[in-house]
């Protein structure tokens, strides 16, 4: 089996899936205490890196995604599949798991 080199540009989500670069989690508390990796909350905010073509409707047409590349989004805490590319964390999830676009 041939090895596949993954990068953001080689990942193309299918259907209504969205590929999101996860924002960095907080390194310390408001009081200045440094947090170990095991105590950090899983981030729920990230930037859309890739978007699928959209959900297929019953008549065969596609429903265009509501988010686009570069949008900053808030998504469900335990949604999707976590993917690590190099030192960056990504999550691949369905568009329905995106709660809001953040400006």
UniProtKB/Swiss-Prot annotation:
A Gene Ontology biological process term: chaperone cofactor-dependent protein refolding
CDD domains documented for this protein: cpn10
Subcellular location: Cytoplasm
Assembly and oligomerization: Heptamer of 7 subunits arranged in a ring. Interacts with the chaperonin GroEL.
UniProt cross-references to PANTHER family, sorted A to Z: 10 KDA HEAT SHOCK PROTEIN, CO-CHAPERONIN GROES
NCBIfam families registered for this protein in UniProt: PRK00364.1-6 (NF001530), PRK00364.2-2 (NF001531), PRK00364.2-4 (NF001533), PRK00364.2-5 (NF001534)
Protein name, entry field: Co-chaperonin GroES
Organism of derivation: Prochlorococcus marinus (strain SARG / CCMP1375 / SS120)
Gene that encodes it: groES
């Amino acid at each position: 089996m041939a090895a596949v080199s993954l990068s953001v540009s080689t990942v193309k989500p299918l259907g209504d899936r969205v590929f999101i670069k996860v924002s960095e989690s907080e390194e310390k508390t408001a009081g200045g205490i440094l947090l170990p990796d095991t105590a950090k909350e899983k981030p729920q905010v990230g930037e859309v890196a890739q978007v699928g073509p959209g959900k297929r409707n019953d008549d065969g047409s596609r429903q265009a995604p509501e988010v686009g590349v570069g949008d900053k989004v808030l998504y469900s805490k335990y949604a999707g599949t976590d993917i690590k590319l190099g030192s960056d964390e990504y999550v691949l999830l369905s568009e329905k798991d995106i709660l809001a676009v953040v400006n």
